[in-house]
Amino acid sequence: MTHQIAVLPGDGIGPEIVEQAERVLKALDLPLELRQAPVGGAAFDQFEHPLPPATLELAQGSHAVLFGAVGDWKYDTLPREFRPEQAILGLRKALGLFANLRPAILYPELASASSLKPEIVSGLDILIIRELTGDIYFGTPRGVRTAADGAFAGEREGYDTMRYAESEVRRIARIGFESARKRNKKLCSVDKANVLETSQFWRDLVIEVSRDYPDVELSHMYVDNAAMQLVRNPRQFDVIVTGNLFGDILSDEAAMLTGSIGMLPSASLNAAGQGLYEPSHGSAPDIAGQGIANPLATILSAAMLLRYSLNLAPQADRVEAAVRKVLADGLRTADIHEAGTTKVSTSQMGDAVLKALG
């Protein structure tokens, strides 16, 4: 069976890093059909929309999507619906992507690159699972109005709605428990149940779902404490499951524990296992075209694609082992380079991973 992969390089460094991930996928000699399409600012320049119908159709008809990055300062003056970042939101909605998986792994060779002391972060391996479809990002009503009453009656006020449906919480909780079951059987649910009704609802439902997973140790933590504990003692965590807003913030915080966001892959999945795979970093237009971007997060995202959407765990293991090999050999792109290591370009890092694949 041939697996069709939609390849959407995007903007900034997106094309450079996606190119290296494509090379790795092709080197595995698998029945893959890689089909490219424009997205983000690159698509707007051609079609006056960040997510053209043909690109969306390709993504919907593919087994998985390999995504680079979108965004550039030159598009910041566009109406919001035409900005490059709307492409990723449109893809999440159209594909029904509800679970974002972001590993935060500190490779031993990069321990000194972390902003924390090695004795605190050594051995770090956290999986943060973020719900993508609900919460304050998508709740309605929202907008700007004149306050009708209260302490600020008559003033303009901005407002949003934080909401979660029961089915949304239950399905992301199950992803959390299933993931924890495959790892160290520890799941921490992060909320703000001491203040927010939405969070208390979340916590109650997670506890209900936990009864189906008696082998998984469930704990709860308020988001403010979780933010502190990620810096104070990050190794206490194995799998974290949380809502859209909290997950957005905590996953970026966890990323910096690893030394470089250029090392971190991510996967966004729907109920059928179809997924969008992208590096956790942005488009970095300031370094685009210079050949210095780190492609490893995108290559590791390709490994996640093999594992989660194509069920090709052995091939995913090979890619991840190849990345560990190049790091052990002392090869570094500019973002993770330090004294005693060898600085390489984007394409040279890709070459090294291909060589390590054998």
Curated annotation (Swiss-Prot):
Pathway: Amino-acid biosynthesis; L-leucine biosynthesis; L-leucine from 3-methyl-2-oxobutanoate: step 3/4. SMART domains: Iso_dh (SM01329). The keyword Electron transport does not apply. It holds the Pfam family Iso_dh. It is found in: Cytoplasm. GO terms for cellular component: cytosol. Substrate binds at R92, R102, R130, D224. It comes from the Bacteria. GO terms for biological process: L-leucine biosynthetic process. GO terms for molecular function: 3-isopropylmalate dehydrogenase activity; magnesium ion binding; NAD binding. Keywords: Amino-acid biosynthesis, Branched-chain amino acid biosynthesis, Cytoplasm, Leucine biosynthesis, Magnesium, Manganese, Metal-binding, NAD, Oxidoreductase. Mg(2+) binds at D224, D248, D252. It catalyses: (2R,3S)-3-isopropylmalate + NAD(+) = 4-methyl-2-oxopentanoate + CO2 + NADH. It is an enzyme of class 1 (oxidoreductase). Its EC number is 1.1.1.85. Binds 1 Mg(2+) or Mn(2+) ion per subunit. Its cofactor is Mg(2+); Mn(2+). The record marks Y137, K192 as: Important for catalysis. InterPro entries: IsoCit/isopropylmalate_DH_CS, IsoPropMal-DH-like_dom, Isopropylmalate_DH. NAD(+) binds at G282, S283, A284, P285, D286, I287, A288, G289, Q290, G291, I292, A293, N294. Belongs to the isocitrate and isopropylmalate dehydrogenases family. LeuB type 1 subfamily. HAMAP family: LeuB_type1 (MF_01033). Catalyzes the oxidation of 3-carboxy-2-hydroxy-4-methylpentanoate (3-isopropylmalate) to 3-carboxy-4-methyl-2-oxopentanoate. The product decarboxylates to 4-methyl-2 oxopentanoate. Homodimer. This is 3-isopropylmalate dehydrogenase.
